[in-house]
Amino acid sequence: YPLRRQRQMCIRDRNNYYKLMMSILKETDPDVMKKIFENFFVNGNLVGWKKQEEYRKKYNCNIPWAVLLDPTSACNLHCTGCWAAEYGNRLNLTFDDIDSIITQGKEMGIYMYIYTGGEPLVRKQDIIALCKKHNDCQFLSFTNGTLIDEEFADAMLEVKNFMPAISVEGFEEATDGRRGQGTFSKVVKAMEILKRKHLPFGISACYTSQNIDSISSSEFFDQMIEWGARFVWYFHYMPVGNDAATELLPTPEQREYMFHQIRKMRMEKSIFAMDFQNDGEYVGGCIAGGRRYLHINANGDCDPCVFIHYSNANIHDMSLLEVMQSPIFMAYHDGQPFNDNHLRPCPMLENPEKIKEIVEKTGARSTDLQSPESVEHLCGKCESYACNWTPTANKLWEERQEEKRQKKQQQK
């Protein structure tokens, strides 16, 4: 029983995961811990999964595990290379809009809701009110962290089902360089408040060609642990938007370094690390298009992915189930996985011909209302990257398959 042996080893050796679990148990508010267990583990992964499977079979379409949505396109910062900034800053989903999305989602077994933006905490009061109304759901928000204060942390303690993932770019120089002078100190203050009040939170980090060494260093992992973060979610820079800086795309050598470094840190540091782009092997490739999540922007447009702003569905005009049956979402359903090598999972970044075909076939339009980007322009920025990454991805993929074969042989 491999999993049982791993659990026994974790306890016996007092390894990094043992330390992580012990710190979570000892340092998290017990009522918050109980609510996370009920909403995330029981509702989101046991009760909800059964309902989702029923809908998948009945309607022959994707049903997501989580819904990402933008309460607002407004933000108090303007970060370099931010895909969300492309939407402008005057759009909002009303309280009733979000309430309806969540209500519909729960009917299909969806209990996980993730706020993006814009800066979601511009809508603090509505976010807390939604947590109260839907106290059987787990809410997470990607946030720059600058609007987290004592009062909001107390509200988090009251509702118990809200968790922030705070965006940082590394240490002070890198964070302030991309997010604005003084941002880092505000973020550190927010994390101090959360840690003091025994509220769990994580880190969201975007790696680029410019920050990849510092943001993945052992020292940075130690700093995140010191801040009190329980997880870190790494995102590969995406060249989305007409003005995207393609020079920020990591080189194949840098991405390969991240592939190995994150796996190394997982075995050494007491924080759970995820890499949205390089961990495709654990989730069967692309999870967008409603396979595990979709994205609803502040205008109500339903994008298959938070990074792919094309759609022919709007939540104001159709139900959530109808969105999942719309042309672009069905194209994802029918086309996934987009590559058998799950280190090349994305129909845009690593397989740009796929998203071009999907958009043209389904007649999807750009949902970027401020500066619409043609799919040809988007794909043109990815073609060279995809070509350069393919040999490295194929090498790594074959090595991983061989490792798995050898491990399976040893367990016989």
Q: Predicted regions span which residues?
A:
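Short cysteine clusters
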Residues: C10, C75, C79-C82, C286, ...
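Single conserved hydrophobic/aromatic residue that forms the stacking wall/gate
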Residues: Y1-L3, R7, I11
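Short, charged low-complexity linear segments at domain edges
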Residues: N43-P64, M274-F276, G280, N314-M330
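Canonical Radical SAM [4Fe-4S] cluster-binding loop centered on the CxxxCxxC motif
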Residues: N60-N62, A66-F95
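Flexible mid-to-C-terminal extensions adjoining Fe-S/redox cofactors in radical SAM and related proteins
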Residues: F307-K412
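Radical SAM/AdoMet-radical enzyme domain recognition
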Residues: F95-Y115, L121-F235
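Radical SAM enzyme [4Fe-4S]-AdoMet core and its adjacent flexible, acidic
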Residues: R4-R5, D176-G289, A298-N299, D303, ...
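N-terminal [4Fe-4S]-dependent radical SAM core
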Residues: N15-L68
